[in-house]
Amino acid sequence: MDLFEYQAKELFAKHEVPTSAGRVTDTVAGAREIAEEIGKPVMVKAQVKVGGRGKAGGVKYSADADAAQANAEAILGLDIKGHVVKKLLVAEASDIAEEYYISFLLDRTNRTYLAMCSVEGGVEIEVTAEENPDALAKIPVDAVKGVDLAFARSIAEAGKLPAEVLDAAAVTIQKLWEVFINEDALLVEVNPLVRTPDDQILALDGKVTLDENAAFRQPGHEAFEDKDATDPLELKAKENDLNYVKLDGEVGIIGNGAGLVMSTLDVVAYAGEKHGGVKPANFLDIGGGASAEVMANGLDVILNDAQVKSVFVNVFGGITACDAVANGIVGALKTLGDEANKPLVVRLDGNNVEEGRRILAEAAHPLVTVVGTMDEAADKAAELAFAAK
C-alpha cells in the first residue's frame, strides 16, 4: 500500500525522524488557516501517489497566507498524471543548503534489504542511476544485524555526504530504518533529505510503501487506506476476505487456487479471440473452501461489475469436494436471488465430481450451464459474454 506524503510523515514523526512542521487539508480555507498558524513561508504540496508533482505545478512556495490560499486554489482539483488532487499538505518552508537521497527497500534478487544513498538528491533517482551511477551507493543490509548508528554512518559515507553532517545524517538514517522495519514497509524513501544552513538534517519529502500482507500485525495501518481511490469492488472483496483483482474484460472468473485461476484467465483470453475479443474481467480466488457464503460473496462482487456479461466458475475438488462446491453454488444463487442475473458456466472436476454435477443438474437453475472441460467452459463463457455485449 502506497502512502501519501502526509501519511509517510506521520510515520516519520512517530519514529522521531526530523521533518518540517505542517498539516493536511482538503480545502482552500484550511490551507490559509494552516499557513497562518505556521506564521512563516510555507510549501503547498499536492497529495497524490505519483511523482513529478513539482513539474506539474503541484508544489508551490507561498510567502504568506494570501499566497498559500491562492496556490491552494490553483492546486486543488489539478490533474497530475491522471490523479486528481483532493488533499494538500501545507508545511513550513525550509532553507536548503544541500539535497541528498536515502532509501531502504527489499533487494529481491539477493534476498535481503538494501540501502541506497546519494549526495545528489532532489531529482528523480532513476535519472541519477542512469546518468551518474557512481553517485548512487547501494549498501546491502544484514536482516539480522539491521542498522545501528555506526552502520547508518557508513551508509552516509558511502553516499558521499559531507563529513560535517555525517553524525546528524546517521541519526536520521537509523530512524528511517526503524520506520522500515517496525512498520513492515517495502520501501522508505526520502528525496530530498536536506541539509539546512545550520547543518540540520530534515526529511522534506517522504515515500513509504507498506506490506499489506503484514496488516494483521499492524492494526493502525488500516487508517492509511485510501478508500476513495480504491475500486469499490476490490474494497467489497477485501471486506469479505476474497483474493480479487479487477481486470478490464467481460468474463467473470471464480476459481479455487491461484494457479487454477491464472490458468483460467489464459484459456478465457484464448477463447475470447474467437468471440469478439472478450477477455477475463477479474481474478478471484475463493481458496480451499467453497461454502455457500464464500461463493455468494464471490458472485456478489463479480455480478456487481457492470462490465461482466458472463461468469466462469472453475473448481477442482480436493479437500473441499465437488458436491460441497455445488451446494455452495446452489445456495449462493438462492441467497443472491434477483441479483444473480448473468449466465454462469460451471466446470467441476476432482473429488466427488459426479455428485457435484448431479446436484447442479437437479437444481436446474436457468442461468447455470455445466460443462465438462476447462476449454469447453472457457469457450462457452466467452460466447455468452460476446452475445450479451
From Swiss-Prot:
Keywords noted in UniProt: ATP-binding, Ligase, Magnesium, Metal-binding, Nucleotide-binding, Tricarboxylic acid cycle
Cofactor mode of binding and number, as noted: Binds 1 Mg(2+) ion per subunit.
GO aspect biological process, one term: succinyl-CoA metabolic process
InterPro entries recorded: ATP-grasp, ATP-grasp_succ-CoA_synth-type, ATP_grasp_subdomain_1, Succ-CoA_synthase_bsu_CS, SUCC_ACL_C, Succ_CoA_ligase-like_bsu, Succinyl-CoA_synth-like
PANTHER family given in the database record: SUCCINATE--COA LIGASE [GDP-FORMING] SUBUNIT BETA, MITOCHONDRIAL, SUCCINYL-COA SYNTHETASE BETA CHAIN
Quaternary structure annotation from Swiss-Prot or TrEMBL: Heterotetramer of two alpha and two beta subunits.
Protein's name in the database: Succinate--CoA ligase [ADP-forming] subunit beta
Chain's gene name: sucC
